[in-house]
Amino acid sequence: MIHYHCADISGDKFLELAGHHLLVSHAYPRRVSDAHDIAATMLLDNGAYTAWTVGKEVDWNDYYTWVEPWIGKYPTTWCVIPDIVDGGEEIQDKLISQWPHNNRGSPVWHLDEPIPRLLSLIDGGWPRVCLGSAGEYAEVASNGWMARMNSVFNKVDKTFGQMPWLHGLRMQGIACGRSSGNFPFGSVDSADVARNNNRKQNTITKMVTAWDKQQPRVPWRQRPEQRELADFTTTL
């Protein structure tokens, strides 16, 4: 599993990220050129989560223009196709249909959307599909979130027989077994290093190395699922 680390770090400490897999968000784009100079591979994020947290709309045409030179020059750079957190299926499908850069992007499936939509995206020829937390599953690692993720991976495993490349947006900690999660993503991302490297006990090199060593258990083994409340009410 690849760990993408947010590259929004100031000063010379940024260079300690050299040789690792890095992420630059459209919401914080200042390091995009520098990161391409030192990264093993690059992920360009659309900034949808940041926009959602502050109630801001994103100019997607600006995003298309921003990613174009990087995915054009660097074969190891990919990006997240625009999405709107809590936007609903119709809006998400429209944004995917408007994407101008073919399979250099990956679509987002939100946990509050129907699982068949995820299966359709996986089967649609995209190199990977991103999973994002939203709606009643907005809080990563909550009990409801964990139950939903177990259902998702159970269904994906049963449907395809082998695990496709799924990318966990903001799911690095839960994917690696620091809790009861341990989900076999192809890749995950996190801003942990960018946010917490200034703590006394931390260095960038130490943090990145520790994260990159953590890998989920494979293969996926079917897990017990919690029945939804609606399932009980329909049987009464």
Feature-to-residue mapping (PLM):
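Glycine-rich phosphate-binding active-site loops on the catalytic face of alpha/beta enzymes
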Residues: S133-G135, Q172-Q214
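Conserved, mostly hydrophobic/aromatic
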Residues: D45, P107, S180-F183
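Glycine-enriched alpha-helix->loop->beta-strand junction motifs that scaffold or abut catalytic
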Residues: A18-H21, I38-A39, P75-T76, P100-R104, ...
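Active-site-adjacent beta->alpha loops and helix N-cap segments on the catalytic face
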Residues: A27-D37, V85-Q98, E113-R117, E136-K155, ...
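Histidine/lysine/aspartate-rich catalytic loop segments that bind and position anionic ligands
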Residues: P107-A141
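Non-catalytic, usually N-terminal nucleic-acid engagement modules in DNA/RNA processing proteins
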Residues: M1-I96, P216-L236
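Catalytic cores of alpha/beta
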Residues: V58, E113-G124, L166, M171-S187
